[in-house]
Amino acid sequence: AVYINGRYWGLYDLKENMNKDYLAAHYGVDEDTVNIIKRNTVELAGSNADFLRVRSYVVQQNASGANVVVPLTAERYAEFTKWVDAESIADYLIAREYFPDADMFNQKYWRTTDYKVRWRAIFYDSDFALSSERGDVLGHYFNVVGVPSADGSLSQMDLYCGLRSNEEWSDYFITRYIYVTKYYL
């Protein structure tokens, strides 16, 4: 809460800009190798070509145009985790559940072009976590159809749905959720 000379000015939060400079400074990577994608297709830094390839590995459209999860068998999961940091995605989802931000449309992902850092979700924009509406946060993230935004477009949850289709990751997620809530939250 911000008060200036005793007058209430509202609720503000300070946060760093989650851009390639931030990622380079905090993760020790070369900023010229950073790709940042938002809403599954929009390039904020670098290219989205690899992210689109990774998305198509887990979710494809059927004949009627609906998104369908392509299950990640053990072999496919091993390949998928060469590109996506599955443990980081689990931690991201746990944080989103704990800080129940109903605004899941503003998603960002990043990686380095040399894969020293695999695709990870960026946790930011948690302003709606202060609202009283909790909703079914994980239900939204595991919705293969997507979640409609205010402009009518769908925010795709492809990576999360693909990971959930794998038994090894699902077991890891549950175990990690219990551990994090017991020891950290």
Regions found by a protein language model. Give the residues of each.
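A short beta-to-alpha transition loop/helix N-cap that caps and shapes the active-site region
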Residues: 12, 22, 130-134
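Catalytic-loop signature of eukaryotic-like protein kinases
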Residues: 106-114
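C-terminal catalytic region of ATP-dependent kinase domains
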Residues: 115-185
